[in-house]
A protein has these predicted regions:
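Residue-level signal for pocket-adjacent positions within structured domains
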Residues: 28, 72, 79, 85-88, ...
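Conserved phosphate-binding loops in N-terminal lobes of ATP-dependent enzymes
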Residues: 3, 7-73, 80
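Glycine-rich phosphate-binding loop and adjoining helix at the ATP-binding site
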Residues: 36, 41-50, 64-69, 76-134
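Glycine/GP-enriched mid-protein hinge/lid loop-to-helix segment characteristic of carbohydrate kinases
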Residues: 3-7, 19-21, 28-32, 39-42, ...
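Short, small-residue-rich loop/turn micro-motifs
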Residues: 73-75, 172
């Protein structure tokens, strides 16, 4: 049974964060895990991610299945937002089709985006800035990333990384 929540995942170079989001964007059942231990070996990252998602859903089975899964990656994506092209801090996630194989394994819709775009969307909502004409978000984690939104649309550029400051590893990140 699908219910009115979305499973959100933030795949970072150090941690994977997961949680249930309801229709009011409230976060519940937050979980944090190690990215390198789950995805770092690169042997079957889609299988590992599918197993992680299934385990999360089993742990929260009283909520039923999510309506969809939304995943943010610290990556360059293809224009269709179905494939990871480059993920410097997680080498096993380079040139990797994500949405189609995960949808087949999980029988749920899967959406991916750059993690910084999803972080900026959250900040726009939390700070009531949805109508702002130009917004730039800079985010620090394992690396440094940024997102630019102009007139309600993300600035992606020809290769999906317009304005990107780069995947710069930070000491202690």
């Amino acid at each position: 049974m699908k219910t009115d929540w979305v499973l959100g995942l933030d795949i970072g170079g150090t941690h994977i964060r997961a949680g249930k989001f309801d229709s009011e964007y409230r976060l519940e059942d937050f979980r944090i895990s190690s990215s390198p231990s789950l995805l770092g070996r690169g042997e079957d990252p889609i299988g590992a991610l599918a197993a992680y998602i299934r385990a999360y859903c089993v742990d929260h089975s009283e909520a039923g299945l999510p309506r969809a899964i939304s995943i943010g990656f610290p990556s360059t994506l293809n224009k269709e937002k179905t494939m990871l092209l480059s993920t410097p801090n997680l080498p096993g996630l380079n040139v990797l089709s994500v949405t189609e194989p995960l949808e087949k394994k999980l029988a749920l819709p899967v959406f991916i985006n750059r993690d910084v775009n999803l972080l900026l969307l959250n900040d726009l909502h939390v700070h009531h800035l949805e109508q702002a004409e130009i917004v730039i978000g800079c985010y620090f984690g394992t690396g440094l990333g940024n997102s630019i939104r102009i007139n309600g649309s993300f600035l992606n550029g020809a290769h999906g990384v317009a304005g990107e400051l780069g995947h710069i590893p930070l000491a202690g990140g």
